[in-house]
Each structure stands twice: as structure tokens, then as C-alpha cells.
């Protein structure tokens, strides 16, 4: 639909006339704006010179529009009151919803769509137009004039919505379902309409297939620059499976059943849509649209199967090859890995599948765990669902990536850059060169995404390693504090034991146990292992920081962006040349840009893979350190338990010793303070074995008894004082040690209790 400048201001109540939106088969379409409500509508009015037959068609279009109700067919609106009086004739006006996105032709003519729409945009277009055509056919209506100018775009809440307009040539099916009259646009017409043969709904299949092909490739499938008579005689020679009839740069006509390159489809969609186009572009109408599975008119169901595919894109970082896999909702990740092994030769156990953020796919979840709804992002590239494949059996990566093969016409001008070409060929091949440079930039960007995914995964592993290092260091300090306390306690015990052995308690068994404890704790601590691991982790940390500081560790633009912009500008200037200046020309400047882009791509890929190899080496070191740190942490945990057990054992032995000493104090005693000692207390039988001498007299015996009682009281007091001094000394010794580690453990325990 062509756009024109604003028309002279004209009003009808609150409605104000704006610009002409386009010119249809019967008249003009003008936008009107309601100044009070902000509502906009499109008013279609007929030209005065319509023939009776076309006046009849016009009234039929209004009747059809008013009874249709489908989201992909433009809706009729009520003509505002009083506006009919402004019509240039007595024919009724047609009011329709206004779609601010313009028509599909305007969209296709944008520079970036010179080699076809983006994959997501193609899928949403096919879905919308198929839904609209199916609705029309179910209502026994053939459109007969489906083309980009008759499809308008409306921005919905989540994506663009495509709507069919201009049913001026639509035909309701009669009882025989055959029609013989037509006046329409020739380039999208089915052959039987050109031949003025009887036709059915399959004429819309041909138009839809032609439209779909143009949206995929950027040009119409069958000799788009030929006149109708020559076109018909040549194209009818194609086989039923041929979907392309084109001229090469030498003027030779070629037939092909394959979807041409370049386009923006992945390999799976390209293959499936190629077969679907073969159904839609069959020359003979009775066979057209017949699907091998769904039968006659089964093309819509076949298209549904394609549109409902869930596709996972896997970039093999070893070779740079992009693989696409249809996956089901319940397909396991292991099943996907088996398919990947068939395509890449990488064993399942060596495959690592990372998302862009560096997260690995979860083994217990289905293969489709990372897929999103691509239909909601019709303007974006397919990288949003990209998964990066790494081979864990490799310790280094070498660049095995080469630029994609060039289209035939681009290869031709690479060999002959000075060759003059007609303007229409020059325009097409320059667009393909620009697309090739774009493809190099996107391929490079995907590889860089893969390298960054590996880097993000390394940082995740390093973060885990850092947490374990901190935990290991903290545990090492706590263990050291416990060991120091235990060793100090043992040393004090042994020292005090030696001080009192001559006149005090002697126990070889107790002494041996303490010696064994002292030797046992000498093997605890793991200080050397911890120190060695910390040194290795610090060295790894330095390597990772160096990687992050590297220019390739961050997203960059650079040469390819500049070359792509220069190619775009050359192509833009060529397309915008006035018609009288569209002469033959060569492609030297474009070829120079393409060759520079190829060189820049190869150089950048080498840098990416150098960075990737360093990343993989660091990751390997991190993965080697993780189990070693876990092992040391586990050993320190066992050491800590051992120290606690030994400490408990020592404490029990000390208290048992005190218990024995106290029990002896309460037994029979004799002698004087000078002769009484712990050795005697430990052998009470010695007290009983001393000979008794009879007192000389009763008063003397009574006096001696009083002396013994006094002496016993004195000894008890001395023993109590000695025990108190010993306990006080031990308490001071305990207080002098660092007990902060126990406080931290107690706080952790309290926090856990509050959390539970």
C-alpha cells in the first residue's frame, strides 16, 4: 500500500481527515482521526468511474467485510454519522479498523529484509495468514488477490499481528465451488487464473506460497522481472516439486526444488518449509495443497505441524557448527545428547551443554528446559534459545571455524569484481553481500557468546571454590585453636604430673594415655595441605582476573561492525538512486568490503578460541581443586571430632583422679603434716599397718587422741586449700586461651535454632 502526503483538511463532526493510506482496486483509503476520543479508522471510498460490474464487486466487498469476524482479517467499523454525505458518489463507504504498522510491502522493502525476514517474523506471518485464509475458506470465500500490499500490520500486546485487507476481488463460492472471472494483481496469481480457467480455493494456496517464499528469501520465486506472457510459457515447464525459477548473472534460466540461500531460517525449518512450499507452488491446481499425510487441502495442517515445532539450537564450540533439534515436551536430556553424539561424535559423558549465562542444563529436567516462545520475539535472532556444546575431553580448543559458503551470485562477483551488471542484478547481489557480512558478524557474535558462557561457567565454579576455600580456612583456624588448647592442656597436665610424681600420684597407664593423646594430635591440623591448596587457588584466581581483564573477555564491536555499516550504506545509496540513474555497474567496492570482513572474521575467531582455551584450562584447574578442597575439609572435620573425643577423655580422667583423691581424704589418716602426702592417701592400708603403742596412762592417751584429731582437721584444711588452688590455676589457664571459636559456633547454633 503506497503512502502519500496529508490531504487538505476536511472534517465531519469530531472526525478529521488525515493522509491517504493507499489506493486499492476500486478507490482510495484515507485515515480519519476522532479529535475527541482519539479513535482512528480507515475509510475506503470508490472512484466515480467504476463499471457496473465493479460497482457490484464493491457492494459485495462491503457485505463480506461486515459479516466477517476474525483477528487476522481487518474488521469493519460503522461509518461515522454524516460521513456518507461526503462520498463522491452514491456508493456506500467502507469503514475499517486502522492498522498503524503499514502494509507488508513497506515492511519487506526495509533494507534489513532484502534477503528475507527474520525467522520469528516469518513464523508469525505464516501463522496469521494461514489462520485468516482457513477462516475465509471455511466461510466459502476465496480472496484471489493475496499479496504483501493486502496485508497490514498491527502492533499487539506481545507481537505484530498480520491482517488481510482488500476483499474487493474476493469471490463467494457458488454451489459448484468453481469460478471463472477475475481481475487482479498478476505477480501473485495462480496459473489457472492467468489462463482464465475454472478455479477453487487452491488459487489462494499459490498466492500464499508465493508470498511466503518472498518473505523467506526477499524475492518472488518465479522470474519476478519477466512479463506475464513470457513468464507463463517458461514457468509452466517447471516440475511439480520446483519452487524456484530464476536467472543467473549470465541470463541462464534455472529450475530448482530447493530453498535458495541466503535466508534467515535454521536448517530444520528450511527443510520443512521447503517441502511445504512444494505443496503450495504446484502448477496443477488439483494437486496443489495436497499433503502426503493429511491429503487434499491438508497444507494448513502440515503448516501447523511446522509452526508447533519446539526447536533447540546447539552451537558446537569445537567446530562452530550450529545444529538444530526438534524436541518434545517430555524428551529427556539424555535422549538429546544421544542425537548430538550422532551429529558431532562427542560422547554423552563428555558433553557439557551451557546456556548463555553459564548455567549447565539440568540432567533430570527435559531437553526443552531452556526453550522460550520464539513467536513472541519475531524481530530477534534465534540466539535466545541457543545452547553451547563443549567437549570436556578437550583441554584446549583450536579454531576450526570457516566462513559459510557464499551464494552463487556472490561467488561470481568475488571472481569478477569488475564485471558490469544490470541494475536489478546489482541490487540483488549487493544485498546478498551485505547479508553475508551480517552473517559473518552474527556467527562471530555467537562464538563470542559461547566463549562468554564458558567464562561465566568458570566464574560460577570459581565462586563455589572460593566459598569452599573460605570455609576451609575458617575450619583450619578453628581446628588450630582447639589443637592449641588441647596441646597446652596436655603439656600442663604432664608438667604438673612430673612435679608431684615423687610424693604424689603415680599411674603408668594414665601417663601412657596422655603420651598417646599428645602424639595423636600431632597428626591433626592439615596446615600444610591447606596452605598448598590456598596457594594453588590464589594462582588460579590471578589467571581468572587476567582473563577478565583481557579485551576479548568483554563484549566488543570492532571491524566487522564498521564493515557491515559501510556495506549497508553502499547498498542504501544504490537502492535510493533515481530511476534515470539506475545504470549498469561493477561490484569492486562491495567485494573489497566482503574480503576485509572475511579476514576480520578469521582473525577475530582465532582470538576467541585463544581466549576459550585459556578459559577451559582455568576451569580444569578449578574442577581439579574442588574435590581436593572437599577432601581436606572432610579430613579436618574428622580431626576436629578426634580432638573433641580426646579432650572429653582427658577431662573424664582428670575428674576420676580428683574423685579418687577426694575419697582418700575422707578415709582414716595419721601422722603429721610433714609426713602426710598423697602417696600415703593412695595406700590407706599403710596407715593400718603401723604398730600401735599403748599409752602410759589414760590422761596421756586422751591428750594424744586430741592431738590426732587436731592434726586430721589441719590436714583436711590443707587438702581442701590445695584442691582449690589447683582448680583455680586450671581455671586461669583455661581463661588465658582463645575461646572465640566456640562463641562463633554457639552463635551459628543459635541462628540455626531460630531458623528452624
Swiss-Prot record:
Protein's UniProt name: Inhibitor of nuclear factor kappa-B kinase subunit beta
Location of Hydroxyproline modifications: 191
UniProt-listed Gene3D superfamilies: 1.20.1270.250, 6.10.250.2110, Phosphatidylinositol 3-kinase Catalytic Subunit, Chain A, domain 1, Transferase(Phosphotransferase) domain 1
Family: Belongs to the protein kinase superfamily. Ser/Thr protein kinase family. I-kappa-B kinase subfamily.
Source organism of this protein record: Bos taurus (Bovine)
Annotated ATP binding sites: 21-29, 44
Native organism taxonomy: Eukaryota, Metazoa, Chordata, Craniata, Vertebrata
This enzyme's EC code(s): 2.7.11.10, 2.7.11.1
Positions of post-translational S-nitrosocysteine modification: 179
Gene Ontology CC: one annotated term: membrane raft
GO molecular function annotation: ATP binding; IkappaB kinase activity; protein heterodimerization activity; protein homodimerization activity; protein kinase activity; protein serine kinase activity; protein serine/threonine kinase activity
Predominant place of localization: cytoplasm
Record-level GO BP terms: cellular response to tumor necrosis factor; positive regulation of canonical NF-kappaB signal transduction; positive regulation of transcription by RNA polymerase II; tumor necrosis factor-mediated signaling pathway
